[in-house]
Amino acid sequence: MTASLKAIDGSAELTTLMTDLGRQARAAARILALAPPEQKNRALEAMERAIRAGADKILAANAEDVDDAKAAGTTSAFLDRLTLTPARVEAMAEGIAVVRGIADPVGTVTESWQRPNGMTIERVRVPLGVVAVIFESRPNVAADAGVLCLKSGNAVILRGGSESFRSCRAIHDCLVQGLREAGLPDAAITLVPTRDRAAVGLLLAGLDGSVDVIVPRGGKSLVARVESEARVPVFAHLEGVNHVYVDRSADLEMAKSIVLNAKMRRTGVCGAAETLLIDRAAATTHLAPLVTMLIDSGCEVRGDQTVQKVDPRVKPASDEDWDTEYLDAVIAAKLVDGVDGAIAHIHNHGSHHTDAIVAEDVQAAAKFLGEVDSAIVLHNASTQFADGGEFGFGAEIGIATGKFHARGPVGAEQLTTFKYRIHGSGQTRP
């Protein structure tokens, strides 16, 4: 009997269950590391078909999750992240197709050189091994993480939030169907089959050495816990306090379009703008139109004293507002002294995630892009492009804001490490 079936009938303790899942994933990782690209792509193609064929079941399961979340009084932003629609399910399938079409990173020789003694040294991409993904409300993370780990030759253990449990299970069923059609082990993509929160602690401990890296996708408290307690490396961002700076040289219509999209396209995503910075030199031309547009679009604006004067609907900003990830239709706004003032504000209040400048002045843009210490910096584009799909990665497993190994959207290539292959002809070291 498999570990997952033991969990369902309640005959195994959680520690035993999780340890077994880790061992099975480790065994699957050894198989995936050697799987040819064609076999992995066959699995991905079958997963894409299964997601489309199983859309009704996925949506029905999600509807139950959403009903429970509404009954529990969750926020509108949370419900948006939890809710699947036919379009979002189709986007999952399309994302799988894109991942299938990207180059397989495993085995790629990134560098090669020959030493004076005749040895050839190659640096080659290899899988990380077993990736644990701990996430909260977004059920589509199950699909994104599963297919990216498969493409990069990694086994993955998925631990979704209890609120999205049914949705994740329905999606996982489709992924496993694809694995089976391609002759790959079920344990290549494992879903923790329990809502028990103690499972998270066991994952953070590494499952007796089975887990190589952890990726948390969720709120500040989850990510902070993972970074504090994990005994294995973590790819994570704590929060997305993202800024849009509108320079004095900015085209007003472009600025309005970018600011509105950055804040209001989807307020609950980590790439949403949370603070609007406007060049003091553009206050008379740009401030009122931007603030009025946001408020008229249903966004609450919290501003400094100057911003409050342009529209009576602006609420006073507190010190905490400059450090807040709202994930809702709320934005903080203030004037700054040019690009230097914007950079200084972001340095003091940013989260190293995503920040944008709207400017026609290429020197101001270059200064911003060069000096803002964030994983993603944009010139004349919305912060909502902070997404692996928009980078051409097909999907992302998360956005890393640290400075080791992976930074920015974590796609298939970022889920590999490297080893050195050395070819000799009998050389010995003197």
UniProtKB/Swiss-Prot annotation:
One cellular component (GO) term of this entry: cytoplasm
Keyword rRNA-binding applies: no
Gene name of this polypeptide: proA
NCBIfam families in alphabetical order: PRK00197.1, proA
CDD domains: ALDH_F18-19_ProA-GPR
UniProtKB keywords: Amino-acid biosynthesis, Cytoplasm, NADP, Oxidoreductase, Proline biosynthesis
Family: Belongs to the gamma-glutamyl phosphate reductase family.
Primary localization: cytoplasm
Organism: Rhodopseudomonas palustris (strain TIE-1)
Task of the protein: Catalyzes the NADPH-dependent reduction of L-glutamate 5-phosphate into L-glutamate 5-semialdehyde and phosphate. The product spontaneously undergoes cyclization to form 1-pyrroline-5-carboxylate.
PROSITE patterns found in the cross-reference section: PROA (PS01223)
Reaction equation(s) it catalyzes: L-glutamate 5-semialdehyde + phosphate + NADP(+) = L-glutamyl 5-phosphate + NADPH + H(+)
GO molecular function list: glutamate-5-semialdehyde dehydrogenase activity; NADP binding
EC number per UniProt: 1.2.1.41
A GO BP annotation: L-proline biosynthetic process
Metabolic or biological pathway, per its Swiss-Prot or TrEMBL entry: Amino-acid biosynthesis; L-proline biosynthesis; L-glutamate 5-semialdehyde from L-glutamate: step 2/2
Subcellular location as annotated: Cytoplasm
Keyword Disulfide bond: no
Name of a matching Pfam family: Aldedh
Protein name (database record): Gamma-glutamyl phosphate reductase
